[in-house]
Amino acid sequence: MRNLFCIIIVIIYSVTLSAQERITLLFVGDLMQHDAQIKAAQTNGGYDYSDCFKHIKEEISQADIAIGNLEVTLGGKPYRGYPSFSAPDEFLYAIKDAGFDVLLTANNHCLDRGKKGLERTAHLLDSLKMPFTGTYRTSEDRQQRYPLLIEKNGFRIALLAYTYDTNGIKPSTPNIVNYIDTVQIKSDILVARQMKPDAIIACMHWGLEYQSLPHSSQKKLADWLIDQGVDHIIGSHPHVVQPMEVRQDQHHPSRHLIVYSLGNFISNMSRENTDGGAMVKLELKKLWGITRMESCSYSLI
């Protein structure tokens, strides 16, 4: 009888293990290119950015899905940094080589080079088969691509991305930028739910620059997003690291990760606290069809 009991326990344990699925997502902050960086990367034949990622490439590549905020355009020459960013194509090649899987393009610099910058960036990303979300050539393009659904390791992750503004520049017809608009976001969340995702993650370009604490508007919007059905929130824009929190859901056992700002990842900013940022790992576990946050952690860079 004891042997039979042990066999049953082993079988139950084995079945439970086989029913478990896990995925690790890695989020980083702003991928930027200022004039000094562009100059430093210049070689006789072009640009070389391998040094930017050589110490963290392994960690990025180990994640099942690595996501970063592309806060430049790839608008072609002349290459420039602040205030109107256009980075060399080699910067994107290095980002892909470092192991990034998805890039966010909804930020206040996505229209720095106007229609050409938005469309050339999208074309180059597509040519490298690099999924991105937040900016679109046309409304039809947005309808086909958004929300971005990522499928890996048996998981379906719906990724949303929005920006507070584009530095006063309006998108040229027929280009589309995802702005923070609760009416539109609510509609997008409903579309995301129809995709039957295991998790909905909202990436928000929000808040006030250089402030180490989140603004009340960020907190209010985070509360609203969770109430609407978003599972986790990743923030950018302030260029400094802001607090992170794990919030227990009020209605069921789920927990929600809220990162108000990851700060800078690659940049040449020199203001206080802008010379680095955070990488956040989010591990999800699915058991018997139910997805929960297994763990989360961060490292400063």
Stretches with model-predicted labels:
Residues 1-20:
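Bacterial Sec-dependent N-terminal signal peptides
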Residues 19-301:
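Acidic, metal/ion-coordinating pockets
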